[in-house]
């Protein structure tokens, strides 16, 4: 899938002949685990910590050079085997072929005309690599004893993948041998390529991903060397950082949530064939059919014979695409930049603001987003900023006034300002905040554009610079939009324009990932998807936010690492037909502690 660079392709489990003392590596792994388990560094110290962790990782990689499992041939040499295997096991293989596209790498190309909403691809459960198949594999005994594997399905999948890759007779070998040998996720970035991301909003997630992956490797290296249930694993004599990085990258770029066989819970899966599809803007058109027990995908649009077949991965930002999928998507209509805001506890009105926010279902401190499209802020961020800028009298009105409930409902509705003065304040604040963020970058927009145009850069360096450029463009648009809104409301205030009446209002939608948690039906009418954003009122949003704990998470606000504890259940309605979010963005960045 996507544009994934490939140094050498893997085909059969052949270990290298190099030799290194397990005890020597174990000592380095212990040092790495200790370093990665230390408290988070203070402001401005993250880069220093990253370099230190990277240095330890490179020492381990150097010791392990030549020990990784390798495969012969090129990735594409084994596409025919994959198609044959898929066909023999009930998957659809007609109407498309796997080819290399100049810009996006390998993908699916239509060999016949395919109509929009036509079911063209299905993959039965038996072909999927899942947490359940991992528990029933050679990994099962260790899984039953290790709390990290039990709690984090993505790590379980990564080890499942490694164990099956090391077995030449694995059922999934036709699939595994077609996976890329390396990826363009930041785990593969050189230090100079990561340096291009310094001062960006995304860099913190890059650091976190690298640190947590290193911590996981160090933890599991010790487990594999010392745990009695790890003795029979094919990784016992060769579990390298290189292998683990490959496995977690394979999983983070491909994992998806599907229902378990009885439909009672969700689990993680790798889906052969389907994961070859590249991304474009659109709607999610993939779901899981419990009746036929298979993953199904309908066409996003009409595809003519010879055209590439695209799917929509979800409403991801480019930071999420780069960090979790290893590519940058130009003209991403869902791109956004994180912005962390909170009400200071030293604010004399903190208690009142906290109460109003609580009634609206908004935390006093949270990470919001500035969007590429207009308006640049979500209903939730608008509501937060309104409360943040309220006077004492305005807060009292929202807590004790005659229309207090209506006022809470309309906090996220742009048509019903709290007051003209409040609107001027919030847009002024947003303009100032976005302007300050712009000043933290070491280069400006024009310099980045010039650098991209005039330098011969690696794929990863290009992605990094495009990502920081995209952040600046979003922030600059936010500054301009905020300034325009500020002046508009200032004019309304100066002219003494009347405020809209609350009794004429409809509840405003407060976003917070709740919309994405609605479960569309497989093969649903795609036109209905456009109305989802309007379907939830604030009241529904708050109540559904609590219900999300028992449901399937779609979209960008998924559970960390795309997994949940095995005991969690789907409700009865969700069990009938569950749709997973295309290309879960989750990665293996959850903390692992010894």
From Swiss-Prot:
It catalyses: L-histidyl-[protein] + S-adenosyl-L-methionine = N(tele)-methyl-L-histidyl-[protein] + S-adenosyl-L-homocysteine + H(+). One of its GO terms (cellular component) is nucleus. S-adenosyl-L-methionine binds at residues 75, 104-106, 254, 275-279, 325-327. Phosphorylated by GSK3B, which is required for recognition by the SCF(FBXW7) complex and subsequent degradation. Ubiquitinated by the SCF(FBXW7) complex following phosphorylation by GSK3B, leading to its degradation by the proteasome. GO terms for biological process: actin modification; peptidyl-histidine methylation; positive regulation of DNA-templated transcription; regulation of uterine smooth muscle contraction. Residues 1-23, 553-594 are annotated as: Disordered. It is an enzyme of class 2 (transferase). The keyword Cytoplasm applies. Residues 564-594 have a biased composition (Basic and acidic residues). Keywords: Actin-binding, Cytoplasm, Methyltransferase, Nucleus, Phosphoprotein, S-adenosyl-L-methionine, Transferase, Ubl conjugation. Its EC number is 2.1.1.85. Protein-histidine N-methyltransferase that specifically mediates 3-methylhistidine (tele-methylhistidine) methylation of actin at 'His-73'. Histidine methylation of actin is required for smooth muscle contraction of the laboring uterus during delivery. Does not have protein-lysine N-methyltransferase activity and probably only catalyzes histidine methylation of actin. The SET domain specifically recognizes and binds actin, suggesting that it does not accommodate substrates diverging from actin. This is Actin-histidine N-methyltransferase. It comes from Rhinolophus ferrumequinum.
